[in-house]
């Protein structure tokens, strides 16, 4: 049986885009962790495994502009959502963490879900509790900062001698007029290219193969939320 009516269409009341709910998955657990994209999805699956959280269902909600219609589908159409007790959303902060936070908050308000006062904190009503996580996580003062999951992954291996070689390579590339539009992605995949048996792997596959240190201090805020789900 399909999880949603196959011909049901949702139109986002902000961007006007049509969204057709997927019938390829169903809500199977009471704790949902929504991840932005394939890499974050796989990364968080292995993080949950590392933290021994087998009662969490990790779901890829797509790109950042797809969260709003995805939540609308999840809350209003998907079977078994009434049984969900915890919902956590994880995405990149990108170049403007305030804008990223505002976007997720707006999506939660649109479907009348509780809104946490700050990222990495829970908010709840009588039915469900929610939390927001932004990669690469908070700074030393506890404030969320700009960045991506790639930055977080590399932070977990910040003591690796190979990173000095990677940085030298990227500096050389920039001196030769190579415009690195996504420096953290360039750094991460250059790092993987220099690792035996890991060249060409995606971030999520590297997580499965234990390249990233998921018990590193930089993972502590994420670990705390996942364990408290």
Predicted stretch roles:
Residues 33, 141-142, 177, 207, ...:
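Generic alpha-helical structural element
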Residues 39-40, 94-96, 138-141, 197-198, ...:
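Conserved nucleotide-binding/hydrolysis micro-motifs of P-loop NTPases
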Residues 6-95:
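Acidic, glycine-rich catalytic loops of TOPRIM or P-loop NTPase phosphate-binding modules used
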Residues 1-5:
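Helix-enriched interaction subdomains in cytosolic or periplasmic regions
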Residues 187-229:
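Charged phosphate-binding loop/patch that engages nucleotide di/tri-phosphates or the phosphate backbone
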Residues 99-193:
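Activity-critical C-terminal alpha-helical subdomain
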Residues 78-87, 181-186, 200-202:
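A general structural signal for short secondary-structure boundary/capping elements
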Residues 48-51, 78, 108-115, 157, ...:
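Hydrophobic, Leu/Ile/Phe/Ala-enriched alpha-helical segments that form helix-helix packing faces
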